[in-house]
């Protein structure tokens, strides 16, 4: 099992190695282990990743250098030697043609690194078979935005909301616009470039330099309310929350956690929406 933390991670690539991927969303009871080797002001999610590694729950991990916290997490996890396979993917903060080429090259390097680690040969058909199209449901919903939410917190929100809930955080809104039949006709270099294009063409993370397309999230007529999640010591999404609070026309509830299971129980009542 390969764990990942970001929707820009090339999950389909690992299907070409016959590997399953799972988002790392551990929400530990506390940071007893990670606090021993990480700075006190590291964000709670970063600590949760370190905690999961130290508890032996993660053997293969792919990180993305989306922020300083993730870079520190990589350094710390690497120093522990607890992961059999640990990789940091260099993620562009733009979606122009040059950055797409850069990401495609990064995917190539990741492919080679995993071939060397696993001793497996990349299966192109397995990669292509990983792409699927999910139907879009045009029903009224409550959107969960901001920092990623754990399975525990997402379940708590769903249990307290009498309406469909859409996870629109950085791990929940992963949709790739890919036509498999077109990929099949391409040589490898062109195929991975098209793959990089699809990854970067997703609804942008707020960490992207041009995140204006995120406005479509707030302007969706089916959006009937927003639960906005922030994490202690993470400033990125606080700026977006301030903007939404000023301009949004639907009910808005902000919740903050430190990414422990204890804090999830005290982050606010979603039923208030």
Residue ranges and their predicted role:
Residues 1-273:
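An N-terminal assembly and electron-transfer interface module characteristic of large anaerobic redox
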């Amino acid at each position: 099992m390969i764990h990942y933390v970001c929707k820009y991670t090339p999950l389909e690539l690992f299907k070409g190695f016959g590997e399953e991927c799972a988002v790392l969303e551990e929400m530990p009871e506390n940071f007893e282990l990670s606090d021993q080797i990480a700075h006190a002001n590291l964000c709670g999610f970063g600590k949760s990743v370190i905690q999961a590694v130290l508890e032996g729950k993660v053997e293969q991990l792919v990180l993305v250098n989306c922020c300083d916290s993730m870079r520190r997490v990589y350094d710390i996890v690497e120093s522990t030697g607890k992961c059999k396979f640990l990789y940091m993917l260099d993620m562009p903060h733009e979606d122009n043609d040059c950055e797409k080429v850069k990401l495609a090259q990064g995917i190539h390097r990741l492919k080679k690194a995993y071939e060397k680690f696993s001793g497996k040969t990349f299966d192109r058909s397995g990669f292509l078979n990983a792409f699927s199209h999910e139907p879009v449901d045009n029903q009224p919903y409550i959107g969960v935005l901001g920092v990623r939410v754990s399975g525990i917190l997402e379940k708590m929100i769903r249990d307290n909301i009498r309406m469909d809930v859409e996870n629109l955080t950085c791990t929940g809104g992963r949709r790739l616009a890919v036509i498999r039949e077109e990929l099949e006709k391409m040589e490898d270099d062109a195929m991975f470039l098209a793959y990089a294009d699809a990854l970067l063409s997703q609804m942008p993370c707020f960490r992207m330099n041009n995140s204006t397309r995120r406005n479509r999230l707030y302007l969706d007529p089916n959006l009937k309310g927003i639960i906005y999640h922030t994490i202690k010591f993470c400033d990125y999404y606080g700026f977006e929350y301030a903007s939404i609070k000023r301009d949004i026309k639907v009910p808005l509830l902000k919740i903050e956690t430190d990414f422990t299971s204890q804090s999830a129980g005290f982050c606010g009542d979603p039923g208030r929406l």
